[in-house]
Amino acid sequence: KPGMTAEEVFDIAMKVTRENGIPHYERHHCGHGIGVECYDLPSVAPGDKTVLVPGMTLNVETPYYELGWGGVQMENTVVVTEDGCRYLDKGGDALIVLEV
């Protein structure tokens, strides 16, 4: 939501991921802005004090890979609104499993 920092978004994403099945989850960043470039500022990472304002677009992602097991990629694109955010994704929340 507006007024939060990119670092606070990182902290929330890490907390939610750890509380929901991956307690040892570690990342140096878990998202980025989307603007002129696909990977734009801010960086959703520790130390990024960029304050979110309405109209900013962010990609929040929590990929996880484990040798011998496989991987999972959770990713949402949101636009910051006056009172929170609006999801731009149209895929829903269903888990898609790819058999290899």
Report each predicted region and the residues it spans.
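Active-site neighborhoods and metal-handling regions in enzymes and metal-associated proteins
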Residues: K1-V100
